[in-house]
């Protein structure tokens, strides 16, 4: 069932020769047939003048239904005639590629309609009332992304060569057709704020462009798009899962089964209906992270920016809570600036709110210092670290949208009624209100006294830890001297004789009297050293006897042992 759109067994040379050999008389008729009525899904059926920047791209429907399609279009690029009626049971062939005749087909229709249709401005939407949600969906599918998606390298190079061949298309009209695409899409993206109603918004995370054609229920008569909404907000956490939005590779892969596609289409449409936002819609930079939104290099931006955030919040979002998801583009950049400017020059009633944001930033920096390895310990009672550490820890674990949500509510004073993630937006403001007037006006002056006290405290603690080590080391260096001083403390002469010129500090030196002489020494020196050793022993024995006598001990017993 799915093998036919992805069959690579066709011959590129035969296909190219068939395309080149088409005569000029039937070129305009055959080119239009390569696009069945599926192409009208993505563009509104209104007029197009020579001013291409202000109009929508048009494909005439009369030619598409009258001329029979050639054989190569039926094989690969086209649907059978009864395919639009059974769109839910067959894969869309339009999702795979766009033949280069599409550009020349648009070129021909541009030339034909520019001479007949009057100019018409785009100040008001011109789609019929039955199709309110078709334009936001079509903004996600660019012609470049459709042309680039799921094409083998050989076929892509062949189409590139065909599209720029001078024998097939006229250069000036081809360039005008390309400019019509780009300017029409740019102008349509600029007017998104005015063309959509309040309930007609982008979903919270736009899907890749290859899934969008599979997930829309488009009627076969090309007159209206009927999208059914369930309106049940409790099913959103079952509907919105990131398995729908898997990044598409650049090579052809088999499509999933039609039952899964129909379920995913219902889930995605239910989610986009129930999670409408009231703030201004995102700009073109938010919708298209790169010029080719379905390239595999840019698919990571969908997952990192849009698909990473919904897991942190509960799905039952109210209309006023969703300002954190799509904040206005002009309000994102200067959010950091008013916190310091308004703290310096602002009336007193506004100071608590601005200071809470300032203290929240300060708490984040303090917690980063504590967690970063410096280990500067501060007194919890002096700074209320129980409040600031909890708030900073929860803010670091939250997504960046949580901080933007908090800053949004801080500056705009929006009364919020959070259902599930109350602590995500109010974890800093109620706890820090008592200290709102305490810090000074400059942020560094506010941070310096407490950090200075903490650093001074840590320095004194380190100094106290180092001093016992120095005392112990000095005592270890001077261990033999007190022992010798005790031994010779009986007489002052003995204390003087302790200082010897040669000292060999080993384990048992305190118990030895060094009397040896070097082998090269003279006999007189050896005799003198022996005499000094005898005198030293005598003085030591006398000092010991005097100490025992002063203590009241038995001197006779000691003399009997010593002598």
From Swiss-Prot:
SS bond list: none
Listed InterPro entries: WetA
Reported phenotype of the disruption mutant: Loses conidial pigments and exhibits autolytic phenotype.
Induction: Expression is controlled by abaA.
Keyword Nucleotide-binding (UniProt): no
UniProt feature, compositional bias: Low complexity: 272-305
A single GO BP: sporulation resulting in formation of a cellular spore
Entry keywords, A to Z: Activator, Conidiation, Sporulation, Transcription, Transcription regulation
Disordered, as annotated region: 54-81, 112-176, 272-318, 334-356, 430-494, 516-538
The keyword Transcription is annotated on this UniProt entry: yes
Residue stretches of biased makeup (Polar residues): 54-69, 160-175, 430-441
The protein's role, per its UniProt record: BrlA, abaA and wetA are pivotal regulators of conidiophore development and conidium maturation. They act individually and together to regulate their own expression and that of numerous other sporulation-specific genes.
Family membership noted in the UniProt record: Belongs to the wetA family.
PANTHER family from the UniProt entry: DEVELOPMENTAL REGULATORY PROTEIN WETA (PTHR22934:SF25), PROTEIN ESC1/WETA-RELATED (PTHR22934)
Protein name stated in the entry: Developmental regulatory protein wetA
Species of provenance: Aspergillus oryzae (strain ATCC 42149 / RIB 40)
């Amino acid at each position: 069932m799915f093998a036919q759109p992805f069959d690579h067994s066709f011959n590129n040379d035969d296909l190219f020769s068939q395309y080149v050999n088409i005569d000029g008389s039937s070129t305009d008729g055959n080119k239009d047939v390569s696009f069945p009525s599926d192409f009208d899904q993505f563009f509104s059926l209104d007029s197009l003048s020579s001013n291409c920047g202000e109009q929508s791209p048009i494909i005439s429907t009369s030619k598409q239904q009258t001329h029979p399609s050639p054989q190569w279009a039926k094989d690969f690029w086209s649907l059978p005639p009864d395919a639009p009626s059974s769109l839910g049971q067959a894969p869309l062939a339009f999702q795979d590629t766009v033949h280069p005749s599409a550009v020349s087909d648009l070129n021909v229709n541009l030339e034909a309609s520019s001479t007949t249709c009057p100019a018409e401005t785009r100040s008001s939407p011109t789609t019929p009332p039955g199709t309110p949600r078709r334009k936001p969906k079509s903004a996600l599918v660019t012609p470049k992304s459709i042309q680039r998606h799921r094409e083998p390298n050989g076929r892509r190079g062949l189409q590139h060569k065909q599209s720029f061949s001078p024998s097939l298309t006229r250069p000036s009209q081809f360039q005008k057709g390309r400019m019509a695409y780009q300017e029409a899409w740019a102008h349509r993206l600029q007017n998104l704020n005015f063309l959509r109603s309040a309930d007609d918004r982008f979903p919270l995370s736009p899907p890749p462009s290859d899934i969008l054609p599979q997930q829309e229920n488009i009627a076969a008569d090309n007159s209206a798009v009927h999208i059914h909404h369930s309106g049940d907000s409790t099913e959103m956490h079952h509907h919105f899962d990131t398995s729908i939005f898997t990044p598409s590779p650049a090579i052809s892969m088999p499509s999933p089964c039609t039952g899964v596609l129909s379920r995913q289409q219902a889930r995605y449409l239910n989610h986009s209906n129930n999670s409408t936002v009231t703030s201004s819609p995102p700009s073109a930079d938010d919708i298209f992270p790169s010029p080719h939104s379905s390239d595999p290099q840019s698919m990571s931006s969908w997952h990192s920016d849009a698909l990473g955030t919904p897991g942190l919040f509960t799905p039952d979002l109210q209309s006023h809570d969703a300002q954190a998801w799509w904040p206005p583009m002009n309000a994102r950049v200067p959010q950091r600036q008013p916190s310091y400017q308004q703290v310096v020059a602002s009336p007193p009633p506004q100071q608590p709110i601005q200071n809470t944001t300032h203290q929240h930033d300060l708490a984040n920096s303090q917690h980063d210092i504590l967690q970063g390895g410096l280990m500067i310990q501060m007194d919890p009672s002096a700074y209320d670290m129980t409040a600031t550490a909890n708030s900073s820890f929860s803010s670091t674990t939250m997504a960046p949208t949580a901080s933007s949500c908090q800053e949004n509510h801080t500056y705009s004073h929006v009364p919020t009624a959070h259902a599930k993630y109350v602590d995500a937006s109010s974890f800093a403001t109620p706890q820090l209100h008592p200290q709102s007037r305490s810090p000074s006006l400059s942020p560094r002056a506010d941070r310096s006294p407490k950090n200075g006290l903490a650093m001074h405290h840590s320095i004194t603690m380190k100094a106290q830890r180092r001093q016992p080590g120095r005392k112990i080391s000095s005592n270890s260096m001077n261990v033999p001297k007190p022992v010798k001083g005790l031994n010779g403390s009986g007489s002052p002469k003995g204390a003087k004789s302790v200082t010897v010129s040669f000292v060999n500090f080993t384990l048992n030196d305190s118990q030895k009297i060094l009397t040896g002489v070097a082998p090269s020494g003279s006999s007189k020196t050896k005799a003198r050293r022996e005499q000094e050793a005898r005198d030293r022993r005598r003085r030591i024995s006398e000092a010991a006897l005097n100490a025992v006598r002063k203590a009241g001990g038995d001197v006779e017993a000691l003399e009997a042992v010593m002598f």
